[in-house]
């Protein structure tokens, strides 16, 4: 395993998650990370991701655009460089309320991350094919 990696964003695989939402995994277990994973998600105008929680702490920083963060039923306006820190088990989602893409950087405090959909209770591994459909 290499001591370091240089990731060229244009060469990384894009995960199409439905409704035009696309994610790119950055740091992950496959690169040798043992303590965190990260990636970038683009949410198109007018689209929301499903209400969900994770099994680990998550940081999200808005890289571009503006929208709404819904956390435990409370709604917060967010814009470029605003950052959330959400503990595991907390229901949350992001809604793009702008006319342009909402680009977020996500960082998890683990390489073994799951997503549990609030509506159904279904738990799936983060960024796997079982997560692609529209919840």
Task: Report residues per predicted region.
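A short, N-terminal "cap"/entry segment at the start of jelly-roll beta-barrel domains
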Residues: 1-35, 119-135
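Conserved short histidine dyad/triad with adjacent acidic residue
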Residues: 24, 39-54
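Short, charged/polar surface micro-motifs in flexible loops or helix N-caps
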Residues: 31-34, 44-47, 66, 110-113
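Glycine- and acidic-residue-biased ligand/ion/polar-headgroup-sensing regions
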Residues: 57-58, 62-67, 72
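Short acidic-glycine-tyrosine-enriched beta hairpin
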Residues: 73-88
């Amino acid at each position: 395993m290499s001591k370091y990696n240089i990731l060229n964003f244009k060469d990384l695989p894009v995960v199409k998650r439905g409704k035009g939402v696309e994610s790119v995994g950055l740091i992950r277990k496959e690169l040798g990370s043992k303590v965190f994973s990260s990636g970038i998600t683009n949410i198109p105008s007018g689209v929301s991701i499903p209400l969900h929680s994770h099994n680990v702490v998550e940081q999200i920083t808005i890289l571009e655009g503006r929208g709404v963060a819904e956390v435990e039923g409370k709604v917060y306006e967010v814009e470029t460089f605003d950052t959330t820190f959400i503990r595991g088990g907390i229901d949350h989602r992001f809604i793009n309320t702008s006319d342009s893409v909402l680009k977020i950087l996500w960082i998890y405090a683990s390489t073994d991350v799951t997503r549990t959909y609030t509506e159904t209770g279904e738990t799936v591994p983060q960024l796997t094919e079982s997560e692609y459909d529209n919840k």
